[in-house]
Every structure is written in structure tokens, then in C-alpha cells.
């Protein structure tokens, strides 16, 4: 099948030249599959991307209803697109988590890279064995855009269930600034004290953001 002017459509281009040869607009068009009456699927793909300023991050963070509200998209296409984006996120996580020995704050930052793009604050507890290998993890809290609560009871319940010798607590700052707040420092001290009582060490508390990370261990605050 050819488009006007004899150029190959995205699916045919992928077959001939591979997915790397396609633009984001063409890849989205393949996921959408069809356009709407009077509008080619490539035009619909362009409209959709323009709605989110051409940013895959913004598109990925958008809700189903917001994506479906773009004229010609609808809920079925929105669901398909969100599923494709989620698969991409999970692939990224798998690639970043090899190896899973978290013996530096840089590795922790890479391990939790998907958190930096979230618009809501979440808290992740990563459970480690004595050699700092990951043996489990749990997302504890989904907070508002500017606040998240971390309770030692929840953190160490996760650790004890995993039979962990240590934990790394990670949370994101949607603002993009990883600088810890006064509350972040107080929570870190509470977690450290609770861990000492329970015999499960707080290996690190890392704040991640689009502009980098802050490690309490690296900064000598643990």
C-alpha cells in the first residue's frame, strides 16, 4: 500500500527498513492503525502528538480520557496506545535493572529512572540481601504532587516479609528539584532509627528527579 505521492506507509517502511527508520509520528500511526473519516492516520497521529507538545513523556503521563478526547482517537485507540507506552516503560526498567546489585547511588537512580517522569510523588522500598542484590521491592505510597508520607512501619514490614538485611527508600520530586526538604530529612532519621531497632539497615534514602538525584548516604547524612 502506498500513500499519496508514492511514499511508503509506516508499516511498509518498517518491513523494508526496520522500526529505527520511522519517526515518532509514524510509530504512533502504526499503533493507532486507522484514521478517521477525511483524515489519514498520519494526520491523526500528528494531531495527537501536537496535543501533548510533541512529548512522549507528556503523552505517557496523560490519562485515558485525555488521550481519548483528541478528535478521532476515542477510547479504544487510547487504550491501545497506553498499553504500548506501558510496555516501553517496562522494557526500559528491565534494561536498567541489569545488573541488580545496587552498590552505588548512581545505580539506584538508574534503577528507578521511570519514577523521574511521574507527575505524582511515589515511594518505593527496595529490599536487599547482604551483598546489596535486589530481592524485592514495593511501592508504598502514591502521594499528591507536592507531598508524600513515608511511615517506618510500612517500610520495614516490606523488608521483614522479604527477609531483607537492608533497604533503600526512593521517592521522586515531581518539581524536578531533588533537594531534600526538612520533612525528608526528618523521615530519613526516623527510618534510620527504626532500622537500627529492627536489625534492618537503611542503606540509603534517594530522592530522584528529572534534574538528577540526592543520596543521603552519598552526602554523608546516613
Swiss-Prot record:
The keyword Aminoacyl-tRNA synthetase does not apply. One of its GO terms (molecular function) is metal ion binding. A motif (JAMM motif) lies at residues 171-184. It holds the Pfam family UPF0758_N. Keywords: Hydrolase, Metal-binding, Metalloprotease, Protease, Zinc. Residues 101-222 form the MPN domain. PROSITE patterns: MPN, UPF0758. InterPro entries: MPN, RadC_JAB, RuvA_2-like, UPF0758, UPF0758_CS, UPF0758_N. Transmembrane segments: none annotated. Zn(2+) binds at residues 171, 173, 184. GO terms for biological process: proteolysis. Belongs to the UPF0758 family. This is UPF0758 protein Tpet_1235. It comes from Thermotoga petrophila (strain ATCC BAA-488 / DSM 13995 / JCM 10881 / RKU-1).
Amino acid at each position: 500500500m502506498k500513500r499519496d505521492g508514492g511514499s511508503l506507509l509506516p508499516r511498509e517502511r518498517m518491513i523494508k527498513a526496520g522500526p529505527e527508520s520511522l519517526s515518532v509520528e509514524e510509530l504512533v500511526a502504526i499503533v493507532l492503525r486507522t484514521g478517521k473519516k477525511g483524515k489519514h492516520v498520519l494526520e491523526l497521529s500528528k494531531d495527537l502528538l501536537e496535543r501533548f507538545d510533541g512529548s512522549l513523556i507528556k503523552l505517557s503521563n496523560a490519562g485515558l480520557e485525555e488521550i481519548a478526547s483528541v478528535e478521532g482517537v476515542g477510547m479504544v485507540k487510547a487504550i491501545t496506545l497506553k498499553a504500548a507506552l506501558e510496555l516501553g516503560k517496562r522494557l526500559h526498567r528491565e534494561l536498567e535493572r541489569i545488573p541488580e546489585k545496587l552498590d552505588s547511588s548512581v545505580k539506584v537512580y538508574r534503577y528507578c529512572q521511570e519514577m523521574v517522569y511521574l507527575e505524582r510523588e511515589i515511594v518505593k522500598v527496595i529490599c536487599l540481601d547482604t551483598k546489596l542484590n535486589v530481592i524485592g521491592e514495593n511501592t508504598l505510597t502514591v502521594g499528591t504532587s507536592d507531598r508524600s508520607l513515608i511511615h517506618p512501619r510500612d517500610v520495614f514490614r516490606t523488608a521483614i516479609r522479604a527477609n531483607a538485611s537492608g533497604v533503600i527508600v526512593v521517592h521522586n520530586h515531581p518539581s524536578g528539584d531533588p533537594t531534600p526538604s526538612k520533612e525528608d530529612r526528618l523521615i530519613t532519621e526516623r527510618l534510620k532509627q527504626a532500622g537500627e531497632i529492627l536489625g534492618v539497615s537503611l542503606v540509603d534514602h534517594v530522592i530522584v528527579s528529572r534534574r538528577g538525584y540526592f543520596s543521603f548516604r552519598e552526602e554523608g547524612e546516613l
